[in-house]
Amino acid sequence: MLRRSVRISPDLVLRAYRQGLFPMAETRQSHRLYWLDPERRGVLPLDRFHLSRRLRRTVLSDLYEVTTDHDFAATIAACAAPAPGRPETWINPEILHLFTQLHRLGYAHSVECRREDVLVGGLYGVAIGGVFFGESMFSTARDASKVALVHLVARLQLAEFKLLDTQFLTAHLAQFGAEEISREAYRAVLAAALEAPSAWPTAPDPETLRAALSQL
């Protein structure tokens, strides 16, 4: 647990990620952050991503307009907000401030889904080397967060990322092939992936992206 007198900077957060730790607050109203280092870590193997036929049809139907980094502030705010079945979140004002700074520095990124110009789903996380650290997602329309995740995976594959860290394993993520690995195994995979010369794909060619989505 971090004391209030400790100044948490974007640089400290990046150094923590490189060591396998990540920050969370207990509630949206909490004034304290915790560094988490789970014994079992959730990861989503990029080479074994599972996509159902129904969801593939939804993704390729262009039901949603999918963008990246077009509205990071709105995306993280939506992730922080209570939702049906999720009355509380761990994203407090300090998390919002830190990750907004990381976005301005080029490390934190968002994937947004819109329908009729309304933001209805998305996710955000941090990219360092060949690792994308997924933080949170939200959805106010059917499959919107799932579509954002599928687009994220396609983009990470195109950019030759090596690791998608989901922090914890959930039933929602397990349907896509997410799994748990030990802390020791995670640190080994993390160290190797951080050395990869990957870069966040800012604007992949639309035809190349659609081909990547079709092959998932």
Name each model feature, range by range:
Residues M1-L216:
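N-acyltransferase acceptor-side catalytic subdomain
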